[in-house]
Amino acid sequence: MMNLWKGTVRRVGATLLACVLLLGLLPQLPRQAGAAYTDSYLQQMVDWGFMRGDISGNLRPDNPISRAEFVTVINRALGYEKLGGDPFQDVPDSAWYAEDVDIAYTEGYISGTSKTTFSPDSSITREEAAIILTRNLMLQPDTGENTSFTDSRELSEWSRGYIATAARYGLVNGYPDGSFRPKNQITRGEAAILVVKAVGTPVQTAGVHSLGSTWGNVTITS
């Protein structure tokens, strides 16, 4: 089981985001409905600068997202930048993801697969990804731990409350058959959907901004 640390979240927009969620403004989106649905979220991630394609420009929506890729996306989406050093021997300083792993470890929202390994190329499960993002949004786990997913019994004990919260706020949806498939590797496309729902409208530059009639979350990272 992957150890997940709650850590301290430093976000200027945390209070605003929490208020929006508590007011119930997060729209309930349809269950995952194929390539067109996923592609729109991937394009939004690219437009915001949270996700990039490979050297050929391919976004590979159906490929599992690695641990290194996932923390990189989270850091960009939430504006994390603080470096503090990490103990991982399998994260060379020359690796493209080295700084983001350091940031994620320093922020405290993810730990290694052991005291000295991070396993950057390993995949991450759907329940792990949902918990990481839910904790970063400062949302507390539901005490009832009830979800409407048909395979809720497959959820790990440590994830039930957080998944219930994520589902209640519309951060996660199931598949057309009503299942959540918590142990499945989360794909790049699914990760994009999760992050876009969480951050809503990002404000990444300093100054006065008009959000118009925006409904949902607003994340301030400038």
Tell what function each PLM region has:
Residues 186-190:
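Acidic helix/loop microenvironments that form the catalytic cleft of cell-wall polysaccharide enzymes
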Residues 2-41, 46-99, 106-127, 133-160, ...:
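Feature responds to low-complexity, polar/acidic, surface-exposed segments characteristic
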Residues 163:
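Active-site/catalytic core of tyrosine-dependent DNA strand-transfer enzymes
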Residues 194:
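Aromatic- and glycine-enriched pocket-lining scaffold segments that form the walls
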